[in-house]
C-alpha cells in the first residue's frame, strides 16, 4: 500500500487498492497537473521530524515545504512509499446523448489546470478568480465562471448514476449579448474572447477541467472499457451480469434461511376449540350462526393454570369433571363470538403484561430514564421506537406462543367467528411493537397471527453457523422477545377428517355422532321430531344403521329423556378432546421424526410454528440442503436461487400442468386396467435439478451452441443425463414428425389457444426446460432454440431433493415393518407436499385491515406505487355490539331552559339531532323519542379491509426456487413419454384410424389401458412394474429414469390384477367402471366412479350410462346432481356478499358428456390430440414464420 498526500489540507490518504494483479514493486513516479512529461523521482527517505514546539519548517526560499516533504510526528507509524497525487484522472462512462462509451481525461485540480491553460494561451487569470474560489467551485457556478472568462461555448459533462455522463452546453456570448442589448446607449465590450471552448466534468459537487475526450469500446459481457482489445474473465462476466447490469441484476435472488427449530425455551399454550352452528335466515341467505363453543387448554403447566383461572374469572362453564375444558351455550346471535373474543383478548393482554413486567424487572433503570429523558412518569407510556433509544438493555429474553387450534377452523369456524374475534387492539403496554399477519386465501384464513414484540438485549449478528446447520438457534438469533398469538388448523397438517386423522395417529375415538339436522331444526323452529323419549327421528340421521347405533349407545346411558343440547355438547367436547390429543400427538411425532429420521437431535422442532404441511416440508428441505451445502451465511448461498422480476414470469411460463383427458367417449365393453405411477412427484424430485448461478450471456451462448448441435442430429436420441449438455430453460419452436408417427400421448402441452391442450400441433414461442428439449427430440420433433435474453442455462446438475425424498421413503418402509401408522402418515404427507411448495404462485396483492397500513404502505399509495383495488366493510350486525333500545323521555319547559349559560355561535343549519325526533303533543311538555343506538365494540379501522396491489406487475421472489417445480414436471413428462414408447412404439407408421385401441384415459399420473395395453405392460414394460422390482429413487452412479407403476385395479380377495369388463367415459374426471373382475379367482368386487364437482354418493354406473345414452341418442332428458355447499366470504367487494360469513347454498350441476372438448374426434367414440390436419379451432394467435 502506498501513502498518497491528499490534494486538500490534511495529511495522508491510503492509495486506492486494486483487486487485480499488481505490477512488480518499483520506484513510483511523481506528477502534478503542471508537471513536465518527465517527472522527477520521489525521494525514498523519511521526512525530517520536527520537535513538538517548533513551527512548521520552510524551504530556503521561505515558502512552505513541498507536498512530498512531509513532517511526521514521533508517534507516526506510517510505512510505505510516499508519492504525490496524480495530476490527471481517467473516467470511463456512457454518453447519454449518443449511448456510446467514452474516455474522459481530466485535471484533478481546477485552479492549477485553468491557470496553466490561460498562461499557455497568453491570457491572464481575472483577479476575482483566485485559487480558493476555483478549487471550491461547484456545478452551480460554472455559468458565472464562463461569463468571467468570456469563452464562446462551455460543455458540461455531468456524471449520473450507473456510469453515465449527461452533456449540456452553455453559450455565454449569447447571454452577454442579450444582456447588453437591453441596456440602451451602452457600448458592447470590445475585449477579445477566448477563441476556443472549455469542457468541464462535474462529479458530485466538484468541477474538473477536461483535458481530452475520445471514444472507446465497451465489452457487452463484462462492461470493461477498452480501446483496441481486452481480456475479461468468467468471474467478471458473472459479477456484471448478476450484480451490476441494471436489467438482469434483479433476476435471481438468494433464498433466506433460518433454522427449522424454534427457541428451546419457548413457552406454549394451546387453546383447542370447536363450535356448533345453526342456520339463520337473513338478508344474504342461510347464514351459519354459532350457538355453542367448547375449548380445551393444554401446554406449559404454569400457562395452563393462568388460562384456566382467567376462564373461571370470565364465568366460563366447565365441562363435566374436566377442569381444563370449558364451554358456552347460547342461541343469541353474537354472544358466542363476543365471549370468545373477550377471552382471547384478555389472555393475550395478560401474557403481554407479564412479558413487560419481566422486562422491567431486568431493566430497573428504564423508569428513571423515561422520567428524565422522555418526561414520562411511567415507562409504560414509551413507544417501541423510544424504547430502542434507552441505555443498554439487559436481561434474559422470554418467548411466549399462544396457539388457537381447531380442526378445519380456517375454512369454517374462524370465518364464522372472525367478525367478533379478529381484533388486535388489546390493553397492552405502549412499548410493544405489534405486527399482524392476516392472509385470506382460497376461501380460508391462511394466516391470522399477531406478534407483541420487545427488544432482545442478546440479539447480535451470527458469525458461526454450525448451530444453524444442526437446525437449532439461541438467544442471539432473535431480534425480539415476543408473545405470538397464532391460529392453526390441524386439517392443514393432516389433510383428512378428524376421525381419519385420529385413526392415522392411533388415537382413541368415541363411537356415535350427533344429529345436527335435528339441532338445526330445534334452534330454527324451537322443536324437532322425536319419539316419546325425545330421541330424534330416523330421518335426521345418515341412514338406519347410524340411527340404530346411536340409539343403542344412548340407551346404555340409561337416561330417562334424550337431552338434545346436552348430547350435542358432549359430542362437541369429545371432538375437542380428540383434537387436543391430535395436537399433542402431532407435536411429539414430528419432533421425533426430525430428531431420528432427519438426523437433527439439537433442533427443537414445533410443527405448529408453520401453518401447513407444505410450508413444513419446504422448511425441512431447506434445512437438509443448508446442512449439506454449509454456506456459512444467513441464506442458501448462490447454489439455489429464486427467480424474480422478469425471470419469475419466464420460469413460471415453463411450469405446465398435468395431463387429464379421455381419448374415448362412451361405453367401452372390453377389459380395462388402471395403472398409476408410484409417488410420481417424489420420484421426479430425486432426479437431477439445475444448480448454481445461471451462466452469463457469453457462457450461455456457448452452452446454447452445444444444444443446437445436439438437436440437429436428427434420428440420434439424446441421453437425458448427457454431461456435456447443461440444464436450462429456453424459448423454442418445434415441429412435429409426420402424423403417422404421432400418438395420443403428446410430449408437451400448450396454452396458446386459451385452454391447456396436449397437442401434436407445431409449437411456437413455447418456454420449456432442457429436459423437454430431449423429450421432444427423442420423439421425432424438430426443435429450434429462439434467441431470448431471458433464456437461462445453469452451470451444473445436482440432486438437490434426493436426500429429502430418500429419508421419507426410508421412514415409510421402517413404519411398514414396525406397523407404525403415525410414522407412515408423516412420511407420506411430507413426501407428497414438497413439490407443491416449489410451485407456489406469488402475486403482488395483499389484503389488510385499515389499521395494518404502516407508513411505508401509505407513502407507496400516495406515490402511486400501490393501488387499492377494492375496499369492503364488515357489516355492523356481524360485529360485537351493544344496542340501546328505543326509549322516551319527557322534559318540562323549565328543564329545557338554559340557565346561566353563554350563547354559542354556530354556522350549522337548525334541524333535528340525528338520534331523536320531537313529537308534537298538545300539553306543555316536550317528549323526545330516541331511536335505537348501536355502540360498536370496534374501531372504524377494524371495519374496513383493503385489497392492495403493486402497480409494478413484476413479482419479487426470494423464497421459492420455482425452476425446481418446472424441472419436476419436465421429469414427469419424460416418464409419460417413455410410457408412450412402451405402448405405441410398434404403431409408428400406421395411421391413427387403423391402430388398435390401447389406452382410453390419461390422468396426471395414471393411464387406463385395454387388454392389448396390459399385455404390452407385462412384456415390454415389465421393468417399470413395481411388483417386478425396480428403483423409485434416481441413482447418480447409474443414471437412468427412475419411475415405476402398479396396477390399481386389484382383486380384494387374492390381490391379483383385476379388470373392469365394462366402463363409461363422459368427460375428464367423469367416468365409471362398472365392477372389477379377477381373472384368477373370478371374484367380482365394487367398481370405481369419479365425478368431480358432483355429489358422487348420488351417482352410480347405471345412472351415468343412462346419461350418456340419452345424450348420444338425442333424447330430451336432463340429468342433475345437487349437493349442499358452504359459500365462504372473507374479503369481498361483491354487493351480495358479506365479509366473514359462511352461508349454505344448494349447488346444482348438470350431468352430461363432454361438450367443450380439447381434442379432435377420430370417430364416434375415439379422440386424438390436435395436429396439423386437425388444428385447434381456438388458436387465434398470429406468429411470424420465415419459410426457407
Curated annotation (Swiss-Prot):
Known role: Eukaryotic-type DNA polymerase involved in viral genomic replication. DNA synthesis is protein primed, and acts in a strand displacement replication. Assembles in complex with viral pTP, DBP, host NFIA and host POU2F1/OCT1 on viral origin of replication. The polymerase covalently transfers dCMP onto pTP, thereby initiating complementary strand synthesis.
Further remarks about this protein from its record: This DNA polymerase requires a protein as a primer.
Family note: Belongs to the DNA polymerase type-B family.
Cross-referenced Gene3D superfamilies: Helix hairpin bin, Palm domain of DNA polymerase, TPR 1 domain of DNA polymerase
Region (Disordered): 1-74
EC code(s) of this entry: 2.7.7.7
Any GO BP annotation: viral DNA genome replication
Catalytic activity line of the entry: DNA(n) + a 2'-deoxyribonucleoside 5'-triphosphate = DNA(n+1) + diphosphate
Gene: POL
The organism of origin for this protein: Human adenovirus F serotype 40 (HAdV-40)
HAMAP family reported for this sequence: ADV_DPOL
Subunit composition and interactions: Heterodimer with the terminal protein; this heterodimer binds to bp 9 to 18 of the genome. Forms a complex with viral pTP, DBP and hosts NFIA and POU2F1/OCT1 for initiation of replication.
GO CC annotation terms, alphabetical: host cell nucleus
Amino acid composition bias (Low complexity), ranges on this chain: 31-41
Subcellular location: Host nucleus
Protein name per the record: DNA polymerase
Taxonomic lineage: Viruses, Varidnaviria, Bamfordvirae, Preplasmiviricota, Tectiliviricetes
Amino acid at each position: 500500500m502506498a501513502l498518497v498526500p491528499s490534494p486538500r489540507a490534511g495529511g495522508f490518504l491510503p492509495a486506492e487498492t486494486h483487486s487485480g494483479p499488481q505490477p512488480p514493486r518499483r520506484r513510483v513516479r511523481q506528477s502534478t497537473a503542471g508537471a513536465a512529461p518527465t517527472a522527477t523521482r520521489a525521494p525514498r527517505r523519511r521526512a525530517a521530524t520536527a520537535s513538538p514546539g517548533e513551527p512548521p519548517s520552510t524551504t530556503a526560499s521561505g515558502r512552505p515545504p513541498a507536498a512530498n516533504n512531509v513532517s511526521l510526528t514521533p508517534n507516526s507509524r506510517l510505512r510505505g512509499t510516499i508519492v504525490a497525487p496524480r495530476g490527471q484522472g481517467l473516467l470511463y462512462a456512457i454518453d447519454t446523448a449518443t449511448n456510446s462509451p467514452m474516455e474522459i481525461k481530466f485535471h484533478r485540480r481546477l485552479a492549477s489546470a485553468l491557470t496553466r491553460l490561460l498562461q499557455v494561451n497568453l491570457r491572464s487569470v481575472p483577479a476575482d478568480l483566485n485559487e480558493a474560489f476555483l478549487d471550491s467551485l461547484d456545478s452551480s457556478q460554472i455559468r458565472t465562471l464562463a461569463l468571467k472568462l468570456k469563452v464562446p461555448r462551455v460543455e458540461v459533462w455531468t456524471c449520473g448514476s450507473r456510469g453515465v455522463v449527461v452533456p449540456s452546453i452553455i453559450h455565454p456570448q449569447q447571454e452577454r449579448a442579450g444582456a447588453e442589448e437591453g441596456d440602451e446607449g451602452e457600448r458592447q465590450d470590445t475585449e477579445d474572447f477566448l477563441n476556443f471552448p472549455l469542457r468541464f466534468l462535474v462529479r458530485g459537487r466538484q468541477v474538473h477541467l477536461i483535458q481530452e475526450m475520445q471514444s472507446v469500446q465497451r465489452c457487452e459481457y463484462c462492461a470493461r472499457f477498452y480501446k483496441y482489445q481486452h481480456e475479461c474473465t468468467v468471474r467478471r462476466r458473472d459479477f456484471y451480469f448478476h450484480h451490476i447490469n441494471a436489467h438482469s441484476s434483479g433476476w435471481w435472488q438468494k433464498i433466506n434461511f433460518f433454522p427449522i427449530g424454534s427457541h428451546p425455551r419457548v413457552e406454549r399454550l394451546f387453546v383447542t376449540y370447536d363450535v356448533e352452528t345453526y342456520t339463520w335466515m337473513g338478508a344474504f341467505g342461510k347464514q351459519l350462526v354459532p350457538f355453542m363453543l367448547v375449548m380445551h387448554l393444554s401446554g406449559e403447566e404454569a400457562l395452563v393454570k393462568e388460562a384456566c383461572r382467567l376462564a373461571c374469572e370470565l364465568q366460563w362453564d366447565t365441562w363435566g369433571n374436566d377442569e381444563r375444558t370449558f364451554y358456552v351455550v347460547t342461541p343469541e346471535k353474537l354472544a358466542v363470538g363476543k365471549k370468545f373474543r373477550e377471552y382471547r383478548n384478555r389472555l393475550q393482554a395478560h401474557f403481554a403484561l407479564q412479558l413487560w413486567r419481566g422486562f422491567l424487572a431486568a431493566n430497573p433503570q428504564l423508569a428513571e430514564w423515561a422520567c428524565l429523558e422522555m418526561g414520562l412518569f411511567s415507562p409504560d407510556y414509551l413507544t417501541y421506537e423510544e424504547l430502542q433509544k434507552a441505555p443498554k438493555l439487559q436481561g434474559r429474553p422470554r418467548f411466549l406462543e399462544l396457539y388457537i387450534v381447531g380442526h378445519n377452523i380456517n375454512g369454517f369456524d374462524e370465518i364464522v367467528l372472525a367478525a367478533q374475534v379478529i381484533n388486535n387492539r388489546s390493553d397492552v403496554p405502549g412499548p410493544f411493537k405489534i405486527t399482524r399477519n392476516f392472509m385470506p386465501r382460497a376461501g380460508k384464513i391462511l394466516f391470522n397471527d399477531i406478534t407483541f414484540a420487545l427488544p432482545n438485549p442478546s440479539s447480535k449478528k451470527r458469525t458461526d453457523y454450525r448451530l444453524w446447520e444442526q437446525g437449532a438457534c439461541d438467544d442471539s438469533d432473535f431480534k425480539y422477545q415476543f408473545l405470538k398469538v397464532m391460529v392453526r388448523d390441524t386439517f392443514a397438517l393432516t389433510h383428512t377428517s378428524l376421525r381419519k386423522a385420529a385413526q392415522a395417529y392411533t388415537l382413541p375415538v368415541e363411537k356415535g355422532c350427533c344429529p345436527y339436522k335435528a339441532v338445526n331444526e330445534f334452534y330454527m323452529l324451537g322443536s324437532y321430531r322425536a319419539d316419546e323419549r325425545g330421541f330424534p327421528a330416523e330421518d335426521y340421521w345418515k341412514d338406519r344403521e347410524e340411527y340404530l347405533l346411536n340409539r343403542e349407545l344412548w340407551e346404555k346411558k340409561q337416561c330417562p329423556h334424550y337431552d338434545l343440547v346436552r348430547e350435542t355438547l358432549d359430542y362437541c367436547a369429545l371432538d375437542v378432546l380428540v383434537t387436543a390429543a391430535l395436537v399433542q400427538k402431532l407435536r411429539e411425532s414430528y419432533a421425533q421424526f426430525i430428531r431420528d429420521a432427519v438426523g437433527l437431535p439439537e433442533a427443537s422442532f414445533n410443527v405448529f410454528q408453520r401453518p401447513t404441511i407444505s410450508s413444513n416440508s419446504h422448511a425441512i428441505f431447506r434445512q437438509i440442503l443448508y446442512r449439506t451445502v454449509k454456506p456459512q451465511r444467513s441464506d442458501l448461498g448462490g447454489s439455489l436461487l429464486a427467480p424474480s422480476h422478469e425471470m419469475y414470469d419466464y420460469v413460471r411460463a415453463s411450469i405446465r400442468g398435468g395431463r387429464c383427458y379421455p381419448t374415448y367417449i362412451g361405453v367401452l365393453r372390453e377389459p380395462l386396467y388402471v395403472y398409476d405411477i408410484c409417488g410420481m412427484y417424489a420420484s421426479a424430485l430425486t432426479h437431477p435439478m439445475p444448480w448454481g448461478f445461471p451462466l452469463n450471456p457469453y457462457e450461455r451462448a456457448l452452452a446454447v451452441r452445444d444444444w443446437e448441435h445436439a438437436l440437429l442430429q436428427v434420428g440420434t436420441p439424446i441421453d437425458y443425463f448427457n454431461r456435456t449438455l447443461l440444464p436450462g430453460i429456453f424459448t423454442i419452436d418445434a415441429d412435429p414428425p409426420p402424423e403417422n408417427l404421432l400418438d395420443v400421448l403428446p410430449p408437451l402441452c400448450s396454452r396458446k389457444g386459451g385452454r391447456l391442450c396436449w397437442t401434436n400441433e407445431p409449437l411456437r414461442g413455447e418456454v420449456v426446460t432442457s429436459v423437454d428439449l430431449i423429450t421432444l427430440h427423442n420423439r421425432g420433433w424438430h426443435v429450434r432454440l429462439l434467441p431470448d435474453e431471458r433464456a437461462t442455462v445453469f452451470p451444473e446438475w445436482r440432486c438437490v431433493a434426493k436426500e429429502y425424498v430418500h429419508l421419507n421413503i426410508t421412514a415409510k418402509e421402517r413404519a411398514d415393518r414396525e406397523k407404525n401408522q403415525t410414522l407412515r402418515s408423516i412420511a407420506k404427507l411430507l413426501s407428497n407436499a414438497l413439490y407443491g411448495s416449489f410451485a407456489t404462485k406469488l402475486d403482488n396483492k395483499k389484503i389488510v385491515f385499515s389499521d395494518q397500513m404502516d407508513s411505508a404502505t401509505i407513502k407507496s399509495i400516495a406515490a402511486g406505487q400501490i393501488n387499492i383495488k377494492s375496499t369492503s366493510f364488515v357489516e355492523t350486525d356481524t360485529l360485537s355490539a351493544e344496542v340501546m333500545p328505543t326509549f322516551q323521555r319527557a322534559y318540562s319547559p323549565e328543564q329545557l331552559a338554559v340557565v346561566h349559560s353563554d350563547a354559542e355561535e354556530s354556522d350549522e343549519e337548525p334541524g333535528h339531532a340525528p338520534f331523536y325526533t320531537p313529537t308534537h303533543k298538545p300539553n306543555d311538555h316536550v317528549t323526545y323519542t330516541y331511536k335505537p343506538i348501536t355502540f360498536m365494540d370496534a374501531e372504524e379501522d377494524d371495519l374496513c379491509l383493503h385489497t392492495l396491489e403493486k402497480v409494478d406487475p413484476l413479482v419479487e421472489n426470494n423464497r421459492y426456487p420455482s425452476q425446481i417445480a418446472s424441472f419436476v414436471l419436465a421429469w414427469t413428462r419424460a416418464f409419460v413419454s417413455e410410457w408412450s414408447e412402451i405402448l405405441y412404439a410398434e404403431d409408428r407408421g400406421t395411421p391413427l384410424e387403423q391402430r388398435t385401441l390401447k389406452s382410453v384415459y390419461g390422468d396426471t399420473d395414471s393411464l387406463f389401458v385395454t387388454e392389448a395395453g396390459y399385455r404390452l405392460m407385462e412384456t415390454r414394460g415389465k421393468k417399470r412394474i413395481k411388483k417386478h422390482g425396480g428403483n423409485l429413487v434416481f441413482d447418480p452412479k447409474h443414471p437412468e429414469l427412475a419411475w415405476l407403476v402398479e396396477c390399481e385395479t386389484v382383486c380384494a380377495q387374492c390381490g391379483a390384477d383385476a379388470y373392469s369388463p365394462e366402463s363409461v367415459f363422459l368427460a375428464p374426471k367423469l367416468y365409471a367402471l362398472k365392477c372389477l373382475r379377477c381373472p384368477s379367482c373370478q371374484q367380482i368386487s365394487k367398481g370405481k366412479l369419479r365425478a368431480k364437482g358432483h355429489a358422487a354418493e348420488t351417482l352410480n354406473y347405471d345412472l351415468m350410462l343412462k346419461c350418456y345414452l340419452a345424450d348420444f341418442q338425442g333424447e330430451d332428458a336432463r340429468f342433475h346432481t345437487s349437493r349442499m355447499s358452504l359459500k365462504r366470504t372473507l374479503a369481498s367487494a361483491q354487493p351480495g356478499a358479506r365479509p366473514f360469513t359462511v352461508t349454505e347454498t344448494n349447488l346444482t350441476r348438470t350431468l352430461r358428456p363432454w361438450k367443450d372438448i380439447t381434442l379432435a374426434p377420430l370417430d364416434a367414440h375415439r379422440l386424438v390430440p390436435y395436429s396439423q390436419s386437425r388444428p385447434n379451432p381456438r388458436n387465434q394467435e398470429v406468429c411470424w414464420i420465415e419459410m426457407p
